[in-house]
Amino acid sequence: MFNWKDISMAGVIILAIIFSTCKKSTLQASINSPENKVSNYLNQDETSYELISQMTYTEFYEKSQVNWITFDEAYKKCKKNPRPIMVDVYTTWCGPCKLMSSQTFNNMQIAEYINDHYYAVKFDAESKDTVRFDKYVFVSTDISNPKAPHQFAASILDNQLAYPSIVFLNDQIQRLDVIKGFMNAQSFEPILSYYGTGDYQKTKWEEFKKDFKLSVKQ
């Protein structure tokens, strides 16, 4: 099985998938040192969201401030010019995903920081497209089922399919953390900085957050 925790680049996966619906949940421990993982300190309350609009994701892309690329493109760029990768795993029917796309990612300061410090990937967890990078291939688990999760989403999220999920990878394509649920710009800024600057390697999240000075304007 492809292991995002410990392996930079390993083989193709075949997964038995347990599908879960779009929700906000208390974030679970996942990878690396618990003291240096943001998700271990977040305790988000269950919240209901209305769909913000009938905008399609094509419209979101057109209006987006973030330079979204495919995972294969991010992988190739990372090999030439190493930097972290941020993956936004979403679905087209997910209200909180649309809210994060239209508000958080389109905040000018957030978008500029992402573009300057990360390779940003937006991935539809129910896509029917084949994902290829290096010599590895990920496909939909069921082409005939529009709601079937993709192997890539199931792999990178350890089958914990809740949306949106923001995955942070280092420049070796090793997974650092998974942040689940909607976050506004001010909540997201310190997390971006923590993984974007590499402070997670030397500073515990609680210490970093305590000293962090917000600059984002809502």
Residue map of PLM features:
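Thiol-based oxidoreductase modules, predominantly thioredoxin-like and allied folds used
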Residues: 110-146
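A short beta-strand-turn-helix
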Residues: 66-83
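Non-globular targeting/processing and membrane-anchoring segments
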Residues: 6, 21-63, 177-218
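Short active-site neighborhood of thiol/selenol oxidoreductases, capturing the structured segment around
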Residues: 81-98, 120
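Structural micro-motif
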Residues: 139, 143, 149-167
